Regions:
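Conserved class I S-adenosyl-L-methionine
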Residues: 214-224
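Conserved beta-strand signature within the Rossmann-like core of class I S-adenosyl-L-methionine
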Residues: 315-323
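Conserved SAM-binding strand-loop segment of SAM-dependent methyltransferases
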Residues: 261-276
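Feature captures hydrophobic
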Residues: 1-199, 205, 234-236
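A short glycine-rich, Lys/Arg-flanked "PGG" loop and its adjoining helix->strand segment in the class I
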Residues: 302-314
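A short acidic, Gly/Pro-enriched loop at the edge of an enzyme's catalytic core
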Residues: 275-287
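Substrate-binding/catalytic lobe of Class I Rossmann-like enzymes that use SAM or dcSAM, i.e.
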Residues: 323-441, 445-447
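Conserved SAM-binding loop of SAM-dependent methyltransferases across substrates and taxa
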Residues: 225-236
Length: 472
């Protein structure tokens, strides 16, 4: 089925919410049979604030109108799209099912899609609603908010290792031989470039934006399986250090470096927090940080950037790639975001609009050199991941079970759409220290955009041949 780019219901008005929060205690105070003062008002405000906010949010998410009706919905019944089997969701026959209730039932194999998951999800506005359910409110208040407030270093380590140390094969079954878990870049829209081409395009673009040269000291924060570290060392002759908290990734990346003939004196993967890298401040003149900062958390974001600033040389350059959300969100965006936080990226609460990210970078004394918005490129990348995952269904189910297969199938299918329609995006930001002595003129030749020419011949890396022979 072709895409159905229908608009959903928009976000609520903060002004209206504020009126409800402040007027509610006042009205309640006025109907009391005795006189009260400001002290009683503020007591009522503290007691009624959360219930009023929850009630307002739940109501507006349920009755809010679509932004526009330019794309007509087919108006087909729920059972045209999904098989409800004998689940409790049969109560929603003849009306739309809340998306949170549907995806939880799908993960538990209580419902099924009638057809390809991505195809049916394209028509989700015809059969699903994006209202805030009691389960979502419970998750926000008991999990999300406490994690945002606390977000400790120990929490980062536990969540990252729980996620990324699940098993290299789990990720290989959708990431493919490059083992890169960040957005690739489409260079030729007249053909369907392979996943490997998209990732090679991205890694080369990052190195070109860094103006990477032989002998440069490069740090890749959150290096994953070491693919960019290997690419930069092999093709640009840089001295590259990658850091990751995941033990499996560090071992895999180290093997990849050696397979490509990169000695430890030129390329290495360290399994540690980037703050523990054994080098003095200003040691690295090139830093890359690709889709790792989301895990830092909102509370620590500014501190994180200042720590990265200290690692960068005064004449150095950083490419900072981060996933983000749109400012004028729709309720669908929040429901999807909470699903991602609960099931896919726990603790990754720092996916925020571009303006917020830029402000944080500038507050840490970085100067922005360029910004590329890669949302549609992310959609293209995830679509290839989705196809890979589907093709490996039997292997995934045999080792990890049907539930993990379904969670990731839903995640990948929905993320293709979310990235394509602008709910989520990826921002690739090139920046440097905002110092008077920084030589900005010398930076102009490397002021790269997506389609800038490449300065050298790029050689593909070898991809852990022994590992892939075992997976075949």
């Amino acid at each position: 089925m072709p895409p159905l780019p229908a608009e959903g219901s928009a976000s609520f008005s903060n002004v209206h919410l504020a009126i409800v929060l402040f007027a509610g205690p006042y009205v309640f105070q006025k109907i009391l049979p005795f006189r009260t003062g400001w002290t009683v008002y503020w007591i009522f405000f503290s007691l009624m604030g959360i219930p009023l906010a929850v009630g307002y949010w739940a109501l507006i998410s349920r009755i809010g109108k679509r932004i526009n009706e330019k794309v007509a919905l087919p108006g087909k019944p729920l059972d045209h799209y999904v098989d409800l089997k004998n689940s409790t969701l049969k109560q929603y026959e003849g009306r739309k099912v809340p998306m949170q209730k549907f995806h939880d039932a799908y993960f538990d194999a209580k419902v099924d899609f009638k057809g390809d998951v991505l195809d049916v999800m394209e028509y989700r506005h015809d059969w699903a609603s994006f209202e805030f359910t009691p389960e979502l409110f419970k998750y926000v208040f008991t999990n999300l908010i406490p994690e945002v407030v606390i977000h400790s270093k120990t929490q980062d380590e536990e969540q990252v290792r729980d996620h990324y140390d699940r098993g290299n094969d789990f990720y290989a079954w959708f990431l493919g031989p490059r083992m890169v878990y960040t957005s690739g870049v489409v260079k030729d829209i007249t053909k369907m470039e392979t996943l490997e081409e998209l990732q090679d395009n991205k890694m080369t673009m990052v190195c070109e934006k860094l103006d990477l040269q032989k002998g440069d000291k490069m740090l890749d924060i959150g290096c994953g399986w070491g693919t960019l570290v290997t690419h930069a060392a092999k093709n640009y002759g840089a001295d590259v250090t990658g850091v990751t908290l995941a033990r499996n990734q560090a071992a895999f990346g180290t093997e990849r470096l050696r397979e490509n003939g990169i000695p430890e004196s030129q390329g290495r993967i360290l399994c540690m927090d980037f703050r523990d890298v054994p080098h003095d401040k200003g040691y690295f003149n090139k830093i890359s940080c690709l889709e790792m900062a989301e895990h830092v958390g909102i509370r620590r974001y500014g501190t994180f950037l200042k720590e990265v600033y200290d690692l960068l040389a005064d004449d150095g350059v950083m490419v900072f790639q981060v996933a983000g959300l749109r400012t004028c969100w729709q309720f669908e965006d929040l429901v999807w975001g909470l699903f991602m936080n609960k099931y896919v990226f726990p603790g990754a609460d720092a996916s925020l609009p571009l303006g917020w990210v830029i402000k944080q970078l500038e507050s840490a004394n970085f100067e922005i050199k360029s910004v590329d918005v890669l949302g549609v490129h992310y959609g293209a990348t995830i679509h290839r991941w989705y196809l890979n995952w589907k093709s490996n269904e039997d292997k995934v189910v045999a080792k990890y079970g049907i539930r993990w297969y379904r969670i990731w199938l839903y995640f990948l299918a929905y993320s293709v759409i979310v990235a394509r329609q602008g709910s989520s995006s990826v921002f690739q930001i090139t920046c440097h220290k905002n110092l008077n002595g920084f030589h900005r003129i010398l930076q102009q030749p490397s002021h790269q955009a997506i389609h800038a020419p490449i300065s050298r011949k790029i050689e593909s890396i070898s991809c852990n041949g022994g590992f892939w022979e075992q997976k075949a």
